[in-house]
């Protein structure tokens, strides 16, 4: 694939993002662009992310600089992956809400979006989160469920069995398969019927 768009939300797993981006560039895509929410930039500086991708896009006040907006970014990507996807971003996407550059780009995406949740097990098991995940799937998106592994838990400050993202090389392979399965779907959606 030539163009991979990665959306990054504010989960502690964002600290591992450079490893994922490096794997994506090495094994998956020629070009990688990243959209970061404000919460994500508070945990990982965009300047660090820029070292392992082609361009970083942020939520910020409009400027006179010509930057691609959500429609252009959505059309640019051959595959769009949200990594990590918080419960908040999953909920907004499932309910058609666009409150920032990332969520409006999700709404504008002409291809199915791949969500890689990083959510605390207590939240992940809530009925509302599972409903939102099922809504995304019904809408044609893919959700790659977290796996169980020993990981650092922020709230306890200890290493515990928890839900974590799929390892970078394996995730790159999964994304390649998803891209191949959906390749004919890439492109602009058909125009709406007249009268709408």
Question: Which residue ranges define each predicted feature?
Answer:
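A cross-family phosphate/adenosyl-ligand binding-site feature
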Residues: 1-115, 120-196
């Amino acid at each position: 694939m030539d163009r991979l768009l990665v959306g990054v939300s504010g989960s502690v797993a964002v600290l591992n993002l450079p490893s994922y981006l490096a794997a994506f560039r090495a094994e998956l895509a020629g070009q990688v662009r990243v959209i970061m929410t404000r919460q994500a930039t508070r945990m990982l500086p965009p300047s660090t992310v820029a070292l392992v991708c082609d361009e970083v896009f942020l939520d910020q006040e409009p400027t006179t600089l010509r930057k691609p907006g959500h429609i252009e970014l959505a059309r640019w990507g051959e595959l769009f992956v949200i990594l990590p996807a918080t419960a908040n971003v999953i909920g907004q996407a499932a309910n058609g809400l666009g409150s920032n550059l990332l969520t409006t780009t999700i709404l504008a995406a002409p291809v199915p979006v791949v969500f890689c949740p990083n959510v605390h097990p207590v939240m992940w098991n809530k009925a509302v989160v599972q409903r939102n995940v099922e809504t995304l799937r019904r809408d044609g998106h893919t959700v790659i469920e977290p796996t169980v592994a020993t990981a650092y838990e922020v709230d306890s400050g200890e290493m515990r069995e928890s839900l974590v993202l799929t390892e970078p090389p394996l995730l790159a392979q999964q994304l390649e398969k998803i891209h191949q399965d959906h390749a004919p779907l890439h492109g602009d959606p058909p125009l709406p019927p007249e009268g709408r």
